[in-house]
Regions:
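Gram-negative bacterial Sec-dependent N-terminal signal peptides
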Residues: 1-17
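Exported/periplasmic ABC-transporter solute-binding proteins
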Residues: 18-43, 52-53, 57, 61-65, ...
Length: 255
């Protein structure tokens, strides 16, 4: 009987420690999330982590309309802070990483010429994320305007729903894509866009001068439905931990 009681106690404790965390995350974090999920699972093997990726504005709208998320990881501070101001989050946003914009092409475009190459007649299509809903799209337009090329190239711009879709367009159809630099550090991109070699700065992509766009500080909030969710708090703390920063740093993010 004592053995049964002990076993029952162990099983009950295991059941109590199990749980789920639903995360809405900006599409630029896609590649980093493979490693984030793996490392978090090592620390919390009983927790199921569900991740939905998309444009920050679209995810924010879903949350306001009742989508059942516990954590929101935006591509900027505004979308995350606005959820707190509007009463959907438990506390103001905290910055978990700072992203960069990269110019990428698989069409042999001479990226060494910088944004000026976009005016060349050979460049007919330029993919960016929707600047109304995706902060990386906003940053791309800011860069075009500050560099003085926007008026001449605006007719070439193709807006994607998210930064992930902008990358997909750059791989499949567009001459140039303005994407999250994090994608360029992902092993998967070596196969998809860099001839089975690690993507090389100056060859496969160039970083857009950060002086041309507002810093992309990315904010995270715990949403109200997770205020008593210990697993959600554990994930939030993990993202802000040294290990979380180590993972993001691998993908070119800064802090």
């Amino acid at each position: 009987m004592k053995l049964k009681a002990v076993l029952l106690g162990i099983l009950t404790a295991g059941a109590l420690s199990a749980g789920e965390v639903s995360v809405a995350a900006a599409a630029n974090t896609t590649y980093a999330f493979d490693e984030i999920k793996a490392e978090f699972a090592k620390l919390h093997p009983q927790t199921t982590l569900n991740v939905s990726l998309g444009a920050s504005g679209a995810l924010s709208t879903q949350i306001k309309n009742g989508a059942p998320f516990d954590i929101f990881m935006a591509a900027d501070m505004k979308f995350a802070d606005d959820l707190h101001k509007d009463g959907f989050a438990t506390a103001p946003a905290k910055t978990y990483a700072k992203g960069k914009v990269a110019m990428f092409s698989v069409r042999g475009v001479d990226l060494s010429k910088g944004l000026e190459i976009l005016k060349d007649p050979s460049v007919k299509t330029i993919s960016i994320a929707n600047p109304k809903t995706a902060p990386y799209g906003t940053a791309s337009v800011q860069a075009f305007q500050k560099a003085g090329v926007y008026d001449e190239i605006k007719g070439k711009i193709v807006e994607a729903k998210s930064i992930g879709e902008a990358l997909s367009q750059a791989l499949k159809a567009s001459d140039v894509g303005f994407i999250a630099a994090s994608a360029m550090y992902a092993p998967k991109m070596a196969k998809d866009g860099c001839n089975d070699k690690p993507c090389k700065q100056g060859e496969n992509f160039v970083l857009v001068d950060t002086k041309l766009y507002e810093p992309i500080a990315q904010g995270m909030v715990v949403l109200n439905r997770a205020k008593d969710n210990a697993e959600a708090k554990a994930f939030y703390d993990f993202i802000l931990s040294d290990k979380g920063k180590e993972i993001f740093a691998k993908y070119g993010y800064e802090f």
